[in-house]
Amino acid sequence: MLSIAHKIFGSANSRIIKSFYKVVQHINAIEHEFQLLSNEALKNKTIEFKEELKNGKTLDDILVPAFAVVREASKRVLNMRHFDVQLIGGMVLHKGMISEMKTGEGKTLVATLAAYLNALEGKGVHIVTVNDYLAKRDAEWMGELYDALGITVGCILTDTNDLERKNAYQCDILYSTNNNLGFDYLRDNMKFSRSEMVQRGFNYAIVDEVDSILIDEARTPLIISGQVDQDIKMYKKIDNLIYELVEEDYELEEKSKNIFLTEAGTTKIENLLTKHNLIPSNTSLYDIDNIIIMHYIIQALRAHKIFALDKDYIIKNGNIVIIDEFTGRMMDGRRYSDGLHQALEAKEKLNINSENQTLASTTFQNYFRMYTKLSGMTGTAATESEEFLGIYNLQVVQIPTNIPVQRIDLNDDIYCTEEEKFSAVIKFISECHQKLQPVLVGTVSIEKSEMLSKLLTQNKLKHSVLNARYHEQEAYIIAQAGIPGTITIATNMAGRGTDIQLGGNLKMLAKTALANTTDKEAIEIKYKQLSEKVKKDKEIAIQAGGLCVIGTERHESRRIDNQLRGRSGRQGDPGLSKFFLSLEDDLLRIFGSDKIKGVLKKLGMKKDEAIQHTWISRSIEKAQHKVESRNYDIRKSLLKFDNVINEQRKVVFDQRNRILDNDSYDISIIYRDLNSEIVNSIIHDKYYNLDDETYKILSSEFTRIYALTLDYSIISELESKEKVIEYLNKIVDEHFTQKIEEFKSRDQKLWDYAVKKVMIMSLDYLWRDHLAALDSLKCGINLRSIAQKDPLNEFKAEAFSMLENMMNKFYELITQRLSHLRFDIELSETQIPEYNINHTKISRNEKCPCGSGKKFKHCHGM
């Protein structure tokens, strides 16, 4: 029934493309008009468009001439003319959708259309990339085009200082990474004045490689953290005991990456702990005093039995560096939480760093949903269209290729063992190499890429390795992977954002070859020679069959496999793709059904013999689909919990911004209300019969909160609790009135600054502890389901109650801190120094990332 409807009405995707093609015809119709304009007249069109918007026109009203202007400027400045399909891609982005365009279709150029149009409003456009290299490259490359149209362009990299960041955010168009934008948001909400903040709002974002940022990294929170006091020696002590455990002592769940002690394992570890005096004799591991030890044990087990060196992490300069499971890139500055990172450091016999406490956090899911309009680009989004729509309200539109794809996708070859599989891969690579066909081999981990590299070396096949260890050479290596006879090994999809051009990348080859040449004539001659060579090499590569892409394992996500395939066959070039699998591969071993294995046995698999069957390929894709659905459910569930935290984050940040925006607080009004509540609370809690002991408690509380000493002789004569409350309210009011007047009379501005700073620091201090409490609550909340309770509803209720308590403590804390404030303490504002913006972890003696200039332990680490 559905297929009949598609035939009659067309799919939703085809209807969108059809409607945009009509607009393309209008753009093409006026192209000649803009060809006649001078460069200056073309630039002045930007001013005209801005005036039209001021006079009531919308962006949609000026889309046709604006796109025509960008296309004409691109021809003149970049020598590139937007194809019709690229114009459609630009319209998709402008409409707040995801533009799925195959590799080599020019996504970088497509973004200029929507970016220019939306920049005309003057509210800022953010173009988001996955790394600093791409942000810098695209800002410089496309910056020439924007400059020709009078549009300002900024770029923020990891090492950009605060002043440069602020200036970059004021530009019409900003290029940066998702990490830089997210951390700037968190840091801005740790600043002590609006003038120190760098961001200016969330208008429109175009996210390049949108699937990588909004899906692959969706579960990775952005965290600014500080060190906490901790017994780090315990990690080493527990690590030494893990070697005593055997397989029967624990249960491993590879799908969920969880591990549990068996009954035998619990008994063995308890005996070992007692023997090494780590727990008292005759106590259980599950006794309340020993629960923390269990935490150390589980994390040590995970470090040893689940997380693998050169797959999940590498060691660089004596530190554990996490490897992104989707891109194979190093995630510098990121640390595993909850003690896992320390357990890995203990396992690898490295220096153990203290665990961290969260100072500020958010997720990419919630960060990017703050933008008024959001769009994205990628070569592979259709398989995740449900998630994009469900979480981000983003529709995926598949853009037709400019020239039909010529790539041939061969069936998978399946072998019994990994050894047989890699033997077949080497043989296939050798055959391609003999006819000078360029080969790109995709692996799932650094370990596998280096194993394959050794095999190629043994077979005397020259090759390049592209993985997290050699990140700096990534762009150059991947750009030259199309040269005839070249063999390139790439971990997953490292090198995304750089096209593989058959014959080689002329621009990059020239940059390297001419780096030390200054003579203009020599440069021209050499460039011409290189151009001819690239042209000939391209023809040789085409005759050999184009780029051959080999996958050595199926990934959990079909999208990652499609990304690898998509490197071949760009812009109508010929190409080939093929996957080699084995029954020992993680996907088939963990997620593959027994049915697949049963069929393979019936087919009679022999040593070094491959089996090809469309049913098996479909079954593997079904297994991948199951994993994708499971991962989506996990992300969706995590988002529901994070939405609760995000709503609280908005409340606290809004309160913080209102404090920052108010230069003069009439704190006396707040005090009168607060003091009445605090006095009532103290009396209710501490006042029973006013004997000596009760008086001491009461006096201690008043000294702690108000810095006041109570007169026992006066209080002892009061007849009732009400009279005591009345008297205490009176002396507190008098105390505050006198204090406020004294400060104001000496320096009103300094007093206002002191009040604001005390309020901000108090809120930040409590919010930090509140985040830690929410993390603890979230960790154990799923156990409520055992009692037939909905964990999410339980989390919402308790989190709300915790927030109420936090805000009550906030008012008490500012009362206490202002009560103890003395005028002789220096309260002058400090200059805001530059600080390393790559900090996601702060030691207690480092400068606080809020920009106060103080050490962390004296500021947000108090």
Curated annotation (Swiss-Prot):
Family: Belongs to the SecA family.
GO biological process: intracellular protein transmembrane transport; protein import; protein targeting; protein transport by the Sec complex
Location of this chain's protein in the cell: Cell inner membrane; Cytoplasm
SMART domains listed in its UniProt record: SecA_DEAD (SM00957), SecA_PP_bind (SM00958)
Residues binding ATP: 86, 104-108, 499
EC nos: 7.4.2.8
Source organism of this protein record: Ehrlichia canis (strain Jake)
Reaction(s) this enzyme catalyzes, per UniProt: ATP + H2O + cellular proteinSide 1 = ADP + phosphate + cellular proteinSide 2
Protein name: Protein translocase subunit SecA
Enzyme class, broadest EC rank: translocase
